Amino acid sequence: MQFDDVLRGRRSIRGYKSDPVPKALIKEVLGLAMRSPSSMNTQPWNFTVVSGDVLDRIRAGNTERNLAGVPHSREFRIGEAFAGQHRDRQVGVAKQLFSAMGIEREDKAGRQDWVLRGFRQFDAPVCVIITYDRVLASSDDTAFDCGAVTTALVNAAW
């Protein structure tokens, strides 16, 4: 497969088979992703690969916290609500998604279930958690570098 085919064919996956992913394949994908450029070759990323019982516990905890109304914690700021063309894109893709899933606008339970699926990593058999050393947190470059390696990871997995 050519690189332009990867980029053109990429799409967001929101449902996975439960088949285990071979460790050799995970190592290969991570090895490719780590070829990603970084500011001054800092390579600030760390990968934690979780699956099985550990991932099940993470999913259960995420679901419990969400249902209990515990506020989400984030390492990166989200900022204000989207507006203009960005909001239009956000709403447009949500309409397409919910339509494809057969979830009506008034279906609060269906929408909540969708949110919970996200907190369960859409039931993927493997989750890669990308972190960075906090000594680099003051540099905006770190966020860009982690974004670059995340993009490379997604494309390598494709």
Q: How should each PLM-predicted stretch be described?
A:
Residues 1-158:
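Acidic, surface-exposed loops and disordered segments
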